[in-house]
């Protein structure tokens, strides 16, 4: 399977909420850096658990675009949770076998990210955070 085929299949599986289908395209030592909690998630099973919890929490995950530069890819997607719409990008790196070995996630806008973080972080062992305007902080 070529690297492009791995990434296309990975994103299709995400769009179909098929976490088992994503695992075929991940290296055993994959690292996920997420906006949900500060510490990275390491290992295929742990990353798959994070994806399972994410997809169970959000209403929709919609892949939009895939950009490539060598072994580095950027996947552009939309996440929906209630009235919140998140524009997201995953920077993914592929190892020599063509498997995803690194993912760094960026989401916007911040209020929508916090809405997802509040629901998802406790499921992953993290703490829910609040977004407080500067003039209302202690």
Features from the language model and the residues they span:
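C-terminal and inter-domain tail/linker signature
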Residues: 1-138
């Amino acid at each position: 399977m070529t690297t492009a085929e791995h990434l296309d299949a990975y994103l299709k599986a995400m769009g179909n909420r098929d976490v088992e289908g994503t695992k075929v395209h991940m290296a055993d030592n994959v690292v996920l850096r997420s906006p949900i909690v500060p510490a990275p998630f390491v290992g295929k099973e742990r990353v798959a658990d994070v994806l399972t919890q994410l997809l169970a929490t959000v209403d929709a995950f919609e892949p939009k675009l895939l950009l490539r530069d060598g072994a580095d890819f950027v996947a552009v997607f939309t996440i929906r949770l209630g009235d919140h719409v998140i524009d997201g990008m995953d920077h993914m790196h592929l190892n020599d076998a063509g498997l995803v070995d690194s993912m760094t996630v960026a989401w916007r806008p911040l209020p929508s990210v916090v809405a997802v973080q509040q629901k998802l972080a406790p499921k992953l062992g993290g703490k829910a955070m609040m977004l407080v305007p500067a003039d209302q902080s202690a």
